[in-house]
Amino acid sequence: MPPAADLRLVVGYDGSPPSARALDAAVSLLRGRAGGIEVTYVAHLPSMAALSAGAIGEMETDFDDIERELRGMAGEQLAGREERWVLQRRQGPIVEELLAAAKDAATAHADATVVIVVGSSSQVTHRVLGSVAVGLARHSPVPLIIVP
């Protein structure tokens, strides 16, 4: 990829080893370029039809705790390496929300090149049923990097 004048990297991040590798790759991609990293945590609720209002509220509190933990993990991983990052939390289906985050980044930075960066999954269920990376590969209107 030729150096972009402004590179905006949307990194899918959940604290897992694949997402940590994706974040490391984003740091390498951004080195020497203008831009920033949008570390994106997607809080995904299962089908809410079977959940009570109390259960949904409790899950929201859990998501707040997870967001704080992930912000700390990302901060530690990026400390001394990259300071141009923000963590955003989105809620909904993971693929749809990462695509929406990329669209929002493109809208906010009209002259930037937006790239989604995610880690690959080695879980058998993901290989059989599909993973976030596969869903993004099928639907992403922006460049996508899947880090092994």
Describe the function of each predicted region.
Residues 33, 81, 132, 139-141:
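Short, structured coil segments at secondary-structure junctions
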Residues 56-69:
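A short acidic, glycine-rich active-site loop
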Residues 38-40, 86-90, 145:
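General small-molecule cofactor/ligand-binding pocket signal
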Residues 2-53, 139:
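Small/aliphatic-rich secondary-structure junction motif
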Residues 22-23, 49-52, 97-100, 127-129:
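Short, well-ordered secondary-structure micro-motifs
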Residues 41, 119-121, 148:
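Short secondary-structure boundary segments
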Residues 115-139:
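Glycine-rich, Arg-bearing micro-motifs that act as flexible, cationic patches
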Residues 1-4, 76-116, 123:
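Structural beta-alpha unit
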